[in-house]
Amino acid sequence: MITDVQLAIFSNVLGVFLFLLVVAYHYINANTGKIGPKAK
């Protein structure tokens, strides 16, 4: 059975991963919007 400590570690790792994924998505989305019109 999974313990409380294992569940806490798993949820923290998952939360950090999702947060970094959202930050990376916004960073890429913002940069591609600025680079696109300049290239044309």
From Swiss-Prot:
Subunit (UniProt): Component of the oligosaccharyltransferase (OST) complex.
Biological process according to GO: protein N-linked glycosylation; protein N-linked glycosylation via asparagine
Classification via SUPFAM superfamilies: Oligosaccharyltransferase subunit ost4p
TM region(s), chain numbering: 5-25
Organism of this sequence: Drosophila willistoni
Residues exposed to the Cytoplasmic side: 26-40
Topological domains, Lumenal: 1-4
Subcellular location: Endoplasmic reticulum membrane
Highest taxon of the lineage: Eukaryota
Name by which UniProt lists this protein: Dolichyl-diphosphooligosaccharide--protein glycosyltransferase subunit 4
Gene Ontology CC annotations of this record: oligosaccharyltransferase complex
Keyword Ubl conjugation assigned: no
Family that this chain belongs to: Belongs to the OST4 family.
The entry's keywords: Endoplasmic reticulum, Membrane, Signal-anchor, Transmembrane, Transmembrane helix
Coiled-coil residue windows: none
Membrane topology of the entry: Single-pass type III membrane protein
Function: Subunit of the oligosaccharyl transferase (OST) complex that catalyzes the initial transfer of a defined glycan (Glc(3)Man(9)GlcNAc(2) in eukaryotes) from the lipid carrier dolichol-pyrophosphate to an asparagine residue within an Asn-X-Ser/Thr consensus motif in nascent polypeptide chains, the first step in protein N-glycosylation. N-glycosylation occurs cotranslationally and the complex associates with the Sec61 complex at the channel-forming translocon complex that mediates protein translocation across the endoplasmic reticulum (ER). All subunits are required for a maximal enzyme activity.
